[in-house]
From Swiss-Prot:
Coiled coil: none annotated. Belongs to the HupC/HyaC/HydC family. One of its GO terms (cellular component) is plasma membrane. It comes from Cupriavidus necator (strain ATCC 17699 / DSM 428 / KCTC 22496 / NCIMB 10442 / H16 / Stanier 337). The chain crosses the membrane at residues 39-59, 73-93, 150-171, 204-221. Keywords: Cell membrane, Electron transport, Heme, Iron, Membrane, Metal-binding, Plasmid, Transmembrane, Transmembrane helix, Transport. This is Probable Ni/Fe-hydrogenase B-type cytochrome subunit. Probable b-type cytochrome. One of its GO terms (biological process) is respiratory electron transport chain.
Length: 244
């Protein structure tokens, strides 16, 4: 393998950009996240908030109110908001998968984790040491750092797929036999056991994603303050800026 090919492979595995980081102090900012990626991130974040809040009330509904059902449509509105957010979440995920093939190489990091590359795991360990306060300075990355890359695929993406499958399976039950939701996702229910099992796993999945979001927000803010490059502002402007 040529030196150039080896360098490119290591760069892809570690998130190092030869044009931005290796040139050192002469480069202070580089364009990373394209507009579709940034739009997806914030719309997806809003959808997750709506899904979590409405999902909680669907699982633990408020006390019954007196009067006619037609005059108290609160749960109807909650369910409607949940279904709309679910469609936005699912369609957004399909769009994000498409953009991984149409966008720049940073847009593919969410779905491409070089787990068979030694350099990648060295960088993962390095980031784990930094998050555990065992090292004073993290490495510099242009796209997702290697640990974030692992978490985004194996924790966020796979759990999102699970939530979409189980969610639409339950939706298909309500839409009745013969609906496209039931035809496409009806197989999920017998796979997991029965309808109540799907409800339980979907509910647990919600809390799993809530915990991930909390850790994700903490890690992003912490790295923005203590790390060597911008994080939060990068998902707004698209540009990664370096502090040193």
């Amino acid at each position: 393998m040529s030196t150039k090919m080896q360098a490119d492979r290591i760069a892809d595995a570690t998130g190092t950009d030869e044009g931005a980081v290796a040139s050192g102090k002469s480069i202070k900012a580089t364009y990373v996240y394209e507009a579709p990626v940034r739009l997806w991130h914030w719309v997806n974040a809003l959808a997750i908030v709506v899904l979590a809040v409405t999902g909680f009330f669907i699982g633990s509904p408020p006390a019954t109110r007196p009067g006619e059902a037609s005059a108290n449509f609160l749960m109807g509105y909650i369910r409607f908001a949940h279904f709309v957010a679910a469609y936005i979440f699912a369609i957004g995920m399909l769009g994000r998968i498409y953009w991984a093939t149409a966008g720049n190489h940073h847009s593919r990091e969410l779905f491409s984790v070089p787990v068979f590359t030694r350099a990648y795991w060295q960088e993962v360990i390095s980031m784990l040491r930094w998050y555990a306060f065992l090292s004073a300075r993290p490495s510099r990355y242009v796209g997702h750092n290697p640990l974030a890359r692992f978490a985004m695929f194996f924790i966020f993406f796979l759990s999102s797929v699970f939530m979409i499958l189980t969610g639409f399976a339950m939706y298909g039950e309500g839409a009745q036999m013969g609906s496209w939701q039931e035809r496409m996702f009806g197989w999920v229910i017998p796979l997991l056991g029965q309808s109540q099992d799907v409800h339980t796993w979907h509910h647990l999945g919600m809390w799993f994603i809530v915990v991930f979001v909390i850790v994700h927000v903490y890690a992003a803010i912490r790295e923005d303050i203590m790390g060597r490059q911008s994080v939060v502002s990068t998902m707004v402007s698209g540009y990664r800026t370096f502090k040193d």
